[in-house]
Amino acid sequence: MERAVRFSTKKSSETRLLRVGVDLIDRLGIDAVSVGKIADEAGLTRPTFYSYFESVPGLFATIWMEVGPQWLRRMSDLDARPEEFDGVERTIHRAMIEILTAAHRMPEAFEVVQPTVAEWWRGVQREGQFHAEKVSWLVGQRIGSELTAPIDPEVVTSGIASTVLAGMPVRSAMPDGRDVSVSLPELSGISAVTDDFDAKVIVAAIDVIARSGVKGASMIRVARRAQVSTGSIYPRFESLDEVIDRSFEHALRAVVADNLLRAKEAGTPADYGELIIAGLSPSRETWRNFRIEIHLEARHSPPLASRLAASIKESNDVIVTTSPYLRGIPLEVVSPVRYFIYALGIGIAVLHNAGIPVARLDHSRVSVEFARSIERMIG
């Protein structure tokens, strides 16, 4: 098994800043980290920080260089159990999840994260295409589970994926090289063109958050994106928080509910694999990233976490009635699998943003074998 992830034991100002940076990401969230907070907590000056990293994203890039390759290997190790990591590794794990998730919108971090992820993925692919497909599900579940855990702790039960994937064959009975883009289902997205003023503001807020995160949004940016004045927004929305709340309702509850209802047409596990691929289409990019950013922010915002937890429950209730996996499965297995389906959707989107070609993988093969593995587990 891959050994636990640790920082260098050398004592230096740089190492101290790195450790403090990781701790702040874990406690406050990646978008709340600042030079002042890092320097103050490390007991060092701001010029000392700038001499090492130049910027906060530069710190994230250095953290990734220090432990990223080892952490990726650990994430793709079937024998590893992230939910059982000790205190130090647990903190590093949560921080690395946030860096990987946000890196695509931070050029200075992404220029380090992307090539490291690409090198790791080349190693995964050397084990075969079906192996790569299974790893994408394992790592996707682990990412999605960690992003969701502070919001709904029951998501840790999705770790059943490790056992299920371990029970799958080395090779799939389905052939390599299938065209996975044929006859994909059309999934609902977020309309970007509307004459309704409130809807125009909501769609603009969704777009800004998807590009820059919740903390990167402001009423001025939303107004510019909607091509309206800030003064025209305030009579209809009391604050930016209300805009975000309304955006949340529109993008998460409405779109998720619509797409899960469409999933009723997925009569087999193979159809579910096609739904995953369809969800990675370019037309769904804004929706995917908005959903990711809401999870990233809710990890450190109890009010938002409470609203998102209710949305997760609604989604899971629909999953129970629509998923081809859950027909005839005992109750004790239903809950972990529905959380797995939820976590996988988020984690696969994060891998997609990191440059992994998950949209070109044949998820139907893994989906079919996953269902068979569950059947073997329950006898």
Show the residue positions of the predicted features.
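Short, amphipathic alpha-helix enriched in basic
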Residues: K10-K37, E41, G189-R221, R225
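Short amphipathic alpha-helical segment with a characteristic S/N-K-E followed by hydrophobic residues
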Residues: L17, A32, S55-F60, G216, ...
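Short, structured motif recognition centered on aromatic/hydrophobic residues
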Residues: I30-V33, H93-A102, I244, V255, ...
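Short hydrophobic/aromatic patch on the recognition helix
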Residues: A42-F53, A226-F237
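Hydrophobic alpha-helical connector segments
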Residues: T62, R73-A95, N259-R288
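Short, basic, alpha-helical segments at the C-terminal edge of helix-turn-helix-like DNA-binding modules
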Residues: W64-W71, F248-V256
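Amphipathic alpha-helical packing segments from all-alpha helical-bundle domains
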Residues: P107-V139, R284-E285, N289-I292, P302-R327, ...
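Hydrophobic/aromatic-rich alpha-helical bundle segments in the mid-to-C-terminal region
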Residues: F110, Q114, G128-I190, A305, ...
